[in-house]
């Protein structure tokens, strides 16, 4: 133990993974941070292995994926672990963020922690989009065409920017090469940001369900929380490998098993499920530029959250009105996800607009107003 604390490198690992003091009352909702680290390791290991056999060429990409599935030793397992690992990565990150929203983990002194986390989330979405293009199936090709075309909504420079991203006048070989290179690079940038996230967490410690300072009631990370995390790992692997072995394509799209054909447009262009809420926001606004602003605004508004919160009480556990609106927000998010997967027709367009309005209203109106009203009631009581 003395060696761990005196070694210049191992002392850092010791302070983060062994001696790090955590509140004694944190629940299993706090396990998702470690699960996200596990997901990132799975994605990097399987992704690097897949890259050894993948050919980033429009004529070979689809065939190389089939080669991985059929000819590479346990290639099917590596590919399905990578594809389902992305979905589980987002499941864990959405729960992790929902816990942060519920317990106000974004307020001072954890503003930097929250901001870095949001940047990680946005970078995750970019990485996942780039990866979705690589199999070069129908949904990959047309998804890339639709999403990259959104840049053309930018006045004056939009068209030139789209052609710059494509590397030509359409989604083609140059685009696939660029997306593959970036998809390989971004996970390592994500890993670096995760280290920054952990440093920010270590600065002020973790939040807790009560939302109060817990400096007098803390436990070391090891052995109390390492074993707790191991329980979470076992449950995670049980569910994860259940999908990988028995339902590997449940969260995918059958059109992506058809080779990309620029001459045949799919009946419905649907992104992966974790993009659907923001895809619904994009389609809910009639203006192309307005839809793009709405979609990116829905992500960037999370960065402004620490400054929108006005309540002096941390967490929704002691705020019944806020708790009601939070769970309404969760239901609203799932409704957006459902609408994003449907055809752009009534009643889904109207429902998407209502859900989009509530999404922004929750952050811009409900959170600040309820906080001010609660503070006013506290002052009146005193």
Swiss-Prot record:
UniProt binding sites for heme b b562: 82, 183
GO cellular component: mitochondrial inner membrane; respiratory chain complex III
Binding site for a ubiquinone: 202
Locations listed in the record: Mitochondrion inner membrane
GO molecular function: metal ion binding; ubiquinol-cytochrome-c reductase activity
Family, similarity comment: Belongs to the cytochrome b family.
Oligomeric form and interacting partners: Fungal cytochrome b-c1 complex contains 10 subunits; 3 respiratory subunits, 2 core proteins and 5 low-molecular weight proteins. Cytochrome b-c1 complex is a homodimer.
UniProt-recorded name of the protein: Cytochrome b
